[in-house]
Swiss-Prot record:
Cell membrane listed as a keyword: yes
Pfam families in UniProt: OSCP
Record-linked SUPFAM superfamilies: N-terminal domain of the delta subunit of the F1F0-ATP synthase (SSF47928)
Function statement: F(1)F(0) ATP synthase produces ATP from ADP in the presence of a proton or sodium gradient. F-type ATPases consist of two structural domains, F(1) containing the extramembraneous catalytic core and F(0) containing the membrane proton channel, linked together by a central stalk and a peripheral stalk. During catalysis, ATP synthesis in the catalytic domain of F(1) is coupled via a rotary mechanism of the central stalk subunits to proton translocation.
NCBIfam families reported in the protein's UniProt record: ATP_synt_delta, PRK05758.2-2, PRK05758.2-5
Localisation per UniProt entry: Cell inner membrane
GO MF terms held by the record: proton-transporting ATP synthase activity, rotational mechanism
Keyword entries, A-Z: ATP synthesis, Cell inner membrane, Cell membrane, CF(1), Hydrogen ion transport, Ion transport, Membrane, Transport
Alphabetized InterPro entries for the sequence: ATP_synth_OSCP/delta_N_sf, ATPase_OSCP/d_CS, ATPase_OSCP/dsu
Family stated for the protein in its record: Belongs to the ATPase delta chain family.
UniProt name for this protein: ATP synthase subunit delta
Main location: membrane
Gene Ontology annotations for the cellular component aspect, listed alphabetically: plasma membrane; proton-transporting ATP synthase complex
């Protein structure tokens, strides 16, 4: 977790509240996602850590984002630039998504498998996790050959390791003790 998370929280809350009030959650998430990608660019990161005046920095950033930012998004960037906080936009995005997930009662579930899963398998995992977590889930699938077979499911602090690699690791621990 980033050291900027505490700084990012009030900005994320303000953006989230504005987006809810104006029924524009998708638009705001897209603007924040694009802005976060811009801040990750090496050239932009150097500019953010430089000694540019806030107005110049905001204008530069808004110019790079182009039509990806509407007027309210541009105002948000100006406020963040005035306070020297543009580098925390990725953390603002993370907090914004967390607030949205909490409001929509959804949870991100990461499913790691050795091979692509069928739609039937994904549906079964989704249904089981929705029942276990008592909320809707969004599956994010990854392929990792090191799991050998089976799946590893992560949802927040919950980890369900049904992989062959996990079983072998547990067997090794038992044999060594």
């Amino acid at each position: 977790m980033s050291e900027f998370i505490t700084v990012a929280r009030p900005y994320a809350k303000a953006a989230f509240d504005f987006a809810v009030e104006h029924n524009s959650l998708d638009r705001w998430q897209n603007m924040l996602t694009f802005s976060a990608e811009v801040t990750r660019n090496e050239s932009v990161a150097e500019m953010l850590s430089g000694a540019l005046a806030p107005e110049t920095l905001a204008a530069f950033f808004i110019d790079i984002c182009g039509d990806q930012l509407d007027e309210s998004g541009q105002n948000f960037i100006k406020v963040m630039a005035e306070n020297g906080r543009l580098q925390v936009i990725p953390d603002v995005l993370q907090q914004f998504i967390a607030l949205r997930d909490a409001m929509e009662a959804t949870a991100d579930v990461e499913v790691t498998s050795a091979a692509p899963l069928t739609q039937a398998q994904l549906d079964k995992i989704s249904a089981a996790m929705e029942q276990r977590l008592s909320r809707k889930v969004k599956l994010n699938c990854k392929i990792d050959k090191s799991v050998l077979a089976g799946v590893v499911i992560r949802a927040g602090d919950l980890v369900i390791d049904g992989s062959i690699r996990g079983r072998l690791d547990r067997l090794t621990d038992v044999l060594q003790s």
